[in-house]
Amino acid sequence: MTLTSTVRRIPIDDNPTLPAQFVADLKKEYTGTVYYNRFILGQWMAANGVIYRLLADSLAAGDGRFFWPVDKPLHPWRVRIGVDFGGNGSKHAFVATAILPGYSGVVGLASQRIDPVAQDADFLADRLLEFCMAVFARWGEIQYIFCDSAEQTLINHIRARLRRCKLSWLADRVENSAKIRINDRIRLTCILMGGGRFWLLPEASTLRDALATALYSGKHPGVDERLDDGSTDIDTLDAYEYTIERDFKRLTNT
């Protein structure tokens, strides 16, 4: 006996129960991503190549779509800093992100990479304190610092150093990263970009480059997997994602 199966493709437009505006918003948010084929067209599509195609194409075209307008005042509601610790060929990464009022969007405010080779914990803490002071001087707000939860010794050292500086109050705002699924983090940023709710400032150049060059690995067919072989800047991506991952539901209205 031979068993056969048929996969039926069901586009989202074939579902009459969904509100038209909901469908329109979903199409906008998923444009340019693998999720458009999967969730809008009802087609299975392997995740390959550039992850954030909209941003990469925008930077190549020089249209400035993802940069906050220079003539528009920016008033962050919350400012958060993400920290990823380097090692084994990777680098320390700091990213400051603004959450806009009502979770209406996010802005990459500033980012920095630090080479950890031949450096100690004090060197890392010094650079992070300098970064935090610059962010606070510019925006007058730091709600939290979210750090890679795998490095508790470094986190405790950062807290101790913060208590001895001008930003001593910030020591009690150092938290562990939530580390939700990487694919959920990717989908969150895709939704923000597609929905016109993601921007960058020039000071976030390493974040810009990390996002624009992020790739799917393509090593395991049928598996969504981000390339992490040292050829792309995963450290900065992680640091950025730590700043927004806890608000996945708020930022996606789910």
How would you label these PLM feature ranges?
Residues T6-R8, I81, F146:
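Hydrophobic/aromatic beta-strand patches that form the interior of the parallel beta-sheet core
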Residues E245-T254:
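Acidic two-metal-ion nuclease catalytic site recognized across multiple nuclease folds
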Residues K91-A98:
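Short beta-strand scaffold segments in enzyme catalytic cores
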Residues N15-G86:
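ATPase catalytic-site recognition across NTP-hydrolyzing enzymes
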Residues G222-I234:
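Short, flexible active-site recognition loops that position polar ligands and cofactors
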Residues S104-E225, R250-L251:
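Mg2+-dependent endonuclease catalytic cores in nucleic-acid-processing enzymes, primarily RNase H-like
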Residues M1-D14:
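Signature of the SF2 helicase/ATPase Hel1-core->accessory helical subdomain module
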